[in-house]
Amino acid sequence: MFGADKGTADRLDGKKLHIGIVQARFNSGITNALAAACCAELLALGVQDKHIMQVQVPGALEIPVALQAMAERNHYDALIALGCIIRGQTYHFELVANESGAGVTRLALDYQIPIANAIITVENLEQAIARQSEKGADAARVAVEMANLLDALS
């Protein structure tokens, strides 16, 4: 939820992490802002720029296959999905939102790799603009926190 109380995590340290980002180009004004906020937060958390790999795909439905290719390389400590799905007048919104989300979750479980899902689903452009920076930064924090957690649990 936008503006929700997300609690606080211990100090997040991304110094040793390798992060992969898949960004959809569809609604690029929003996804570029998501990516900028995400990358800025990763750097602030100590992730080295050279350890951040970012690729782009046409839209949200293509995000899972690129994430899968990254997961199969076994080079990344966490992955991040960035996209924006804005409701239109057809069922296509539900299809894209549900299938892209399910694909991201399935990959995280199948490959046992944290994937921060910042494919935002909104009713209109105004909602997307209001959420773009916060959700991009949130995705970076989730990726770093979960990568460190899974490392500690292994």
From Swiss-Prot:
Keywords: Riboflavin biosynthesis, Transferase. The keyword Transferase applies. SUPFAM superfamilies: Lumazine synthase (SSF52121). It catalyses: (2S)-2-hydroxy-3-oxobutyl phosphate + 5-amino-6-(D-ribitylamino)uracil = 6,7-dimethyl-8-(1-D-ribityl)lumazine + phosphate + 2 H2O + H(+). This is 6,7-dimethyl-8-ribityllumazine synthase. Catalyzes the formation of 6,7-dimethyl-8-ribityllumazine by condensation of 5-amino-6-(D-ribitylamino)uracil with 3,4-dihydroxy-2-butanone 4-phosphate. This is the penultimate step in the biosynthesis of riboflavin. 5-amino-6-(D-ribitylamino)uracil binds at residues 26, 60-62, 84-86, 117. The active site is at 92 (proton donor). Its EC number is 2.5.1.78.
